Amino acid sequence: GRMADVMAADLVRLAPADKPTIEANLAALKQRLLKFSADSEARLASADNLSVMSLSDHFGYLIGSLNLELIGVDPRPDTEWTPEALKQLTATLKDNDVAVVMHHRQPSDAVKAAIAESGSRLVVLSTDAADPVAELEGNVDLLLKGLSGA
């Protein structure tokens, strides 16, 4: 919301004649985000386990804003996942009853197998969509489905 206010104010200064359109778009965006936030919180409240691990360094903001229980972050490349590291990953996920493992891309088959063996669910989120609000909505939906076991 706040960043949208700043951007809208800048746009009005650059294009004063478009002020009514800019303000209408800002109001629509804020309403969309408010509804999205309320819907997401309601869905989160029904999840039994909010523990996650991220194999990407892209999602700190998302994890924090949803108040998820972050067990760990390990953004190492697929080539650095040794058999011992994969065993440790599986153990960490099992020991901490991690519901969802987040990534910004499909990991290697070996990493997928380690996640599956632990009983956690892999959720691959988008990081480069053209529409950031739609991307956020889609990512949160995928994450909430993963947390609920859907």
Pin down the residues of each PLM region.
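Extracytoplasmic metal-acquisition and chelation regions
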Residues: 1-150
